Amino acid sequence: MFNKFNTKPLWEVSKTLSSVAQGFEPADMVIINSRLINVCTREVIENTDVAVSCGRIALVGDAKHCIGENTEVIDAKGQYIAPGFLDGHIHVESSMLSVSEYARSVVPHGTVGIYMDPHEICNVLGLNGVRYMIEDGKGTPLKNMVTTPSCVPAVPGFEDTGAAVGPEDVRETMKWDEIVGLGEMMNFPGILYSTDHAHGVVGETLKASKTVTGHYSLPETGKGLNGYIASGVRCCHESTRAEDALAKMRLGMYAMFREGSAWHDLKEVSKAITENKVDSRFAVLISDDTHPHTLLKDGHLDHIIKRAIEEGIEPLTAIQMVTINCAQCFQMDHELGSITPGKCADIVFIEDLKDVKITKVIIDGNLVAKGGLLTTSIAKYDYPEDAMNSMHIKNKITPDSFNIMAPNKEKITARVIEIIPERVGTYERHIELKVKDDKVQCDPNKDVLKAVVFERHHETGKAGYGFVKGFGIKRGAMAATVAHDAHNLLVIGTNDEDMALAANTLIECGGGMVAVQDGKVLGLVPLPIAGLMSNKPLEEMAEMVEKLDSAWKEIGCDIVSPFMTMALIPLACLPELRLTNRGLVDCNKFEFVSLFVEE
């Protein structure tokens, strides 16, 4: 497939590149005195030059004959050079940044391309939202390669979203220049039980000869995993155990090792390589979801490479996992992923392999970052009005909106969602709760909080009620419109008054995340773009998120990235128990269940 993200297609400049390589024409740029990280052979080649022309690599080796009067010569001074880093699975919306601001944030860290799955904004605004993010990315040097959201809604019939995407929509988007594949196929039950919708969206992608990305979170790695892969799914980022990743790689599926703000799977999953001594060509490092304070403090793929090295993965192997392996996964290694003739001139300068310190970044033959700062301008994009006005709540939310009734009872046993810190799964617990004035009470002493999800897209007035455990909050409430994947309004708390204040605060500011205690807003992150993102700069967003994080701790929650963990409570494609605006969902059986356990 032609990668339209390059400056020029190879067929258009092939003669020039061949001439430059042979010294018949001068190069635009020559890098000298480098230590080349060759990801094709997993070796470092000392004292190597690279000649660049037309935004592509013309020659790797001795390039003295490629230097002309106007050739820009960059002396690497013995630094390593590697192919630009690629993030194979990322939801930009989770950064809370616009695409352009996200690019400004990650490019200086060596990221030259992302495979963006914009299913968050698509759940709110439909394919219009995808187009908005594509347009936002066009003014940046970052290669914004997009996968069409496959599961909008994530699990049909269990929640209300702002839009829906079907096979005919996927067929249309496969004609878009920016689309390189299908976003994560979360509806693995639909694949395994042969639903027309699930196989239809996969089929339209395969017809276009593009990559189908996956989401297989079941621990079963036999018939189910084989059936899932056989349908055409090429990769999966949902491995949380080494044996999961190893099973996928053995079946020819690219196992994506995730290390984001909340999901720290790398420590365990890296053992698939380090303990089994298998070939790593089917292993890819990805971030999935990264918050602004993480980007500001730790970086992006440079940090994930460093983490992989800390877990025992060889440095060159880790770099392969964000370059050639990723490019091959998306069938784009003829364009990206290696410093070899004909490929995009996307080059990262690394001072130290252990610390993965990035000093320069070149994209398409242009120096775009140096010393941790962007050296090129980025155009600002203004999102349309429908993106900035996405809170459509039918009824006024009051403390009474949070009543959970159980007439003629003194106590009752409820199904409670227990979170697993730093993991995407949950447990179903059965816990006895008190009833007062016919209303079921939460129990902060047992770490059991009330949870309500309000539909916010079509003013249906639907709301789902439940209880959650594991946040540690003793007094207060929190709310978010970042609530995967339908992104309805999720409110959690110990009392109805604070819960109502939290909900109404977000309605007034157009969406976001908030923490409340005793009638006071302690921390607020407004996200006016679809209730998911902001047009504020990284530094300002990181400061607001840090303040919100402190507010969470103030009300008693000390888990890592609590807002990310909270955001997954409605995601009905992940085991074990979830809450959507339609009710409580058993995600093993994929059926609604009663909030109360029958006695």
From Swiss-Prot:
Q: Which InterPro entries is this protein grouped with?
A: Adenine_deam, Adenine_deam_C, Amidohydro-rel, Metal-dep_hydrolase_composite, Metal_Hydrolase
Q: According to its UniProt record, which reaction does this protein catalyse?
A: adenine + H2O + H(+) = hypoxanthine + NH4(+)
**Cofactor(s) the protein requires to work:** Mn(2+)
> Quick one: a GO biological-process term for this protein?
adenine catabolic process
Q: Which Gene3D superfamilies match?
A: Metal-dependent hydrolases, Urease, subunit C, domain 1
Tell me any Pfam family this protein matches: Amidohydro_1
Q: Name one GO molecular function term.
A: adenine deaminase activity
Keywords recorded for this protein, A-Z:
Hydrolase, Manganese
Keyword flag Manganese: yes
Keyword DNA damage belongs to the record: no
EC annotation?
3.5.4.2
Q: Where is the signal peptide?
A: none
What the record says about family reads: Belongs to the metallo-dependent hydrolases superfamily. Adenine deaminase family.
Q: What is this protein called?
A: Adenine deaminase
Q: Which organism is it from?
A: Clostridium botulinum (strain Langeland / NCTC 10281 / Type F)
